A protein has these predicted regions:
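Acidic, Ser/Pro/Thr-rich low-complexity regulatory regions
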Residues: 1-106
Length: 106
């Protein structure tokens, strides 16, 4: 599929929406983890170290997702975000019909 400049601008917005949903999910997961009670053999230091590890892992994931904005990765990015359910078919409603159908048939 050949994407026009307008398609690419729209897909950038769609990708941003999906990435922000993943960010929101991570923040909610991390907040729930931080606020849960300590286990029997866990303390504040252990919790801080786990949060640091999770943040480092998420940073790596987020940097990989930033590649979705590159022209050569847009189609892969939208497909991945759809498969992971960070995007829905409704998110593609602003795209040309040809583009929308291409992503929804995958």
């Amino acid at each position: 599929m050949e994407l026009t400049k307008a398609d690419k601008r729209q897909l950038n917005d769609v990708i941003r929406r999906g990435i922000l949903r993943r960010c929101e999910e991570w923040l909610n997961e991390t907040g729930a983890f931080i606020n849960q009670k300590y286990g029997d053999d866990e303390n504040a230091f252990d919790r801080c170290m786990e949060v640091t590890k999770r943040a480092r892992d998420y940073y790596k994931e987020a940097m990989l997702r930033e590649d979705y904005y590159r022209n050569s990765m847009m189609e892969i990015g939208v497909t991945a975000l759809l498969n992971e359910e960070y995007l829905t078919p409704d998110d593609l409603s602003e795209c040309r019909e040809e583009v929308r159908k291409e992503f929804l048939r995958q």
